[in-house]
Amino acid sequence: GMAAWLRTLGVTRTAVLDRAAPGQEGVWDTFARMPELRTPKQLNGLDMGLPALSVQRWYIARFGEAAWASIDRIPRLHWMDYLRWYRATLQLPVVNGVEVLNVRPATAADEAPAEDCIAVDTLQDGRPHTRLSRLVVLTTGMDGAGAWRVPAFIADALPADRCHHSSDAIDFTQLHGQRVGVLGHGAAAFDNAVAALRAGARSVDLCFRRARLPRVNPHRHIENAGLLTHYARLPDAIRWQVASHFRRVDQPPPRGSFQQACRWPNFKAHAACPWDEVRWTGHDIDVHTSQGRFQFDHVICATGHALDLAARPELQSLAPAIARWQDRFTPPADQTHPVLAAHPYLGEHYECLPRTPGIDSDWVTRVFAFNSLSYVSHGPHSTSISGHKHALPRLVRGITQRLFLDQAHTLVDDLQRYDTQELDLPEDFGIKPAASEPTPSLAALA
């Protein structure tokens, strides 16, 4: 969406670097396993206000008016098909099979054409290559601030083939006839439980720490134009309180995934059942909880991602140089939260800001974080599907503003040199002729 929007504004020298193979970008046809998006079908904004590019128009053209009217959420694989169509239709400049190794200020060794360049070190087809760019946008999704991670006390205790994170590429056919334990209560937990049940798992026990599943989805309350458009202008104290609230009050699993899991007689959900100890007996996975012991053949941890900028190779130069919330805001003593404090403190247009003003300020502010790094600064929905309609224009304004201001020093000289004629007249037109010379008529000049 960003690349398409930039093109409409005349920014055409762009490249979208993606590690995945063509058509496999993102999570939708890889480890996302829900039957449908949890975002209501009307809350998406990749169409740039052009109805012909909307998912609604695409869906109706492919499946018909009745099919669109019958759904309230878009099926996941249909959404991925729409994204493939969107990319092909707009001929977006995606370069696949590229792994970004580092984003850093360009040096003399990079032979940068200007001092304001960013160097992007990449690996493609086994060969290193450094690309130069005036600006860089990080669009690395939910794990762009760290890594999907299995709790260490589980990962360290089990053979690798007996334990997976819900974001892993799991061969569910291998779970046929097995006892499967799932840790977590969110969308990924129930989606993976359903996938295991469909694959013929003997039993699936889903365990979670909370005393009861959330019923209310607080995310729906902030999916409005005012918040999604102007969230970054809120005072720091309010943004901090909102982020803190969402750390305490989680959203429920999607209704469809929950209902599908509960239809299976060999599925059980266990509230207030955190895993206290996990052991490998040589044959079984022995899990100790406050509700007793469980024995599994395989476990899936739907435990989300850890904030860990050091886990992202592309952030190795950026992470030490950027401002964090702990550098710019001190919450009341009863609102402290070390994870939120470690998030980057971003500018209004998602630009990174220097930890120490005046040091590294130019190159750092040329990097925009349109991913989970923006969670505290721009809100929990900013870079999700429901936020695109409002967030993408703000991001694009920041990019074009920076490109324009970079060229401000050329404005006056360019203006003074501008000499494109709009009216084609003889050079001597308007010069008072001698008395003996007739005045040319306008008709003769036409």
Predicted feature residues:
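Conserved N-terminal glycine-rich FAD pyrophosphate-binding loop of Rossmann-like flavoproteins
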Residues: 20-49, 213-230
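Tryptophan-centered motif/residue detector
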Residues: 24-29, 58, 85, 309
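Flexible, active-site-adjacent loop/turn segments at secondary-structure boundaries
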Residues: 29, 35, 53, 57, ...
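Long, low-complexity, intrinsically disordered N-terminal extensions of eukaryotic proteins, enriched
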Residues: 5, 19, 35-46, 54, ...
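Flavin (primarily FAD) cofactor-binding/catalytic cores of flavoenzymes
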Residues: 1-20, 68-199, 203-446
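A conserved beta-strand/loop capping segment in the N-terminal third of enzymes
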Residues: 46-80
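A short alpha-helix-loop-beta-strand transition element characteristic
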Residues: 27-28, 40, 48, 67-70, ...
